[in-house]
Amino acid sequence: MPAGPGSSLILVVEGEWRARQSLVGEFQLAGWDILQAATGEDAIARIRDVGDWMEIVFTDIELPGRLNGWDVADAARALYPELPIIYVSSRATEVLRQVPDSHFFRKPCKASDILAACVRFQRLGYGRPERRSVH
C-alpha cells in the first residue's frame, strides 16, 4: 500500500469519545483511512488484526482500562519496531520519556499540528510497510 493521504492507515487511540471523533473527522477530511480504539486492549487487537498495513499509531497516554498509551506503543513496536507513534497527554511529565520515531503533543493540541507530524513521518518514509522488517 503506497503512502499518501487516501491510502494511509492510522490508528487513533483516544478514550474520550468527543476528542476521538474530532480527530478522526480531521484525518478523514485530509484523506486518511482511520481505525479507532477507545482502550489499550482494543488498540492492540486492531494492530494485530491489521498487520503491517498500519502506518502510524496516534495514542493518548491516559486510556480507560488496564493498558495505557505506553503499553499500546510497546505492543505496536514489538510487532513493528519502525512504526511511528504519536503520543498525546495532558500531563507535562509524560514528555520526559523520549521514544525514537515518535512525536509527543501536550493537550490541548491542534489537529492541524498532529496532521503535520503525520505528514512529516510520511515524507521521511516512516511507517511505510515496505520499509519495515518482516517478523
Language-model region placement:
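Non-catalytic signal-transmission and effector/linker regions of two-component phosphorelay proteins
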Residues: 1-24, 48, 52-53, 82, ...
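Acidic catalytic/metal-coordinating carboxylates
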Residues: 39, 67-72
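Active-site residues of response regulator receiver
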Residues: 60-61
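Conserved sequence signature across two-component system core domains
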Residues: 13-14, 37, 57
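Hydrophobic/aromatic residues positioned on beta-strands within the core alpha/beta folds
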Residues: 88-89
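Short amphipathic alpha-helix used as the core "switch/output" element in two-component signaling
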Residues: 70-82
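Short hydrophobic/Thr-rich beta-strand motif most characteristic of the beta2 strand and flanking loop
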Residues: 31-41, 46
